[in-house]
Amino acid sequence: LWAKLGLLFPYNEFRACWKMGGEALVQRLGDKEYSWDGVVRLVPSMIAAGLLGHAYTCPDMIGGGQFGSFLNIDQDKFDQSLIVRSCQIHSMMPMMQFSVAPWRILSPENLEICRTYALLHEQMGDYILEQARHSAQTGEPIVRAMDYMFPGEGFEECNDQYMLGDKYLVAPVTDSGVSRSVKLPKGKWVDEN
């Protein structure tokens, strides 16, 4: 019942809905902890939400939604690269939001990296809104599984890269490493990075 109330408003975000797949509600993923495991689970969770009928999905907050993780931070043990990587991943998702003010916890250099990716997300805004309108008409998720978009091309178990709408293949580095392999579907692809 509570989630149905959200249908009365043009803007909404829910973290836990039951039997609301297919409705015009933004479904935010459940809280992830501040850890690399939390970052690794972002893409598979977004893909799963879309396949379950939640066309409008929002990842958990950048760096994880457990605010307690950011209280009394020991800067010597705090891994700023996790926040930066999380921000980079979120920049190519339908929505992005910080769990803690980045200027409170990041060095000037890492803050500038996050600012760059927030601006990228802003630049993607018109495209993301176009995809939201498309989702309203078709029910297709904005974040789409590779196998959904390219059936029969061997993407059945691919859960670490996705299509943002039908135009952008997104393959983020989701661990503390600096590179990854990307599996491309048939056709011609352009690296816009």
Question: Where is each model-derived feature located?
Answer:
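Catalytic-domain carbohydrate-binding cleft regions of carbohydrate-active enzymes
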Residues: 1-193
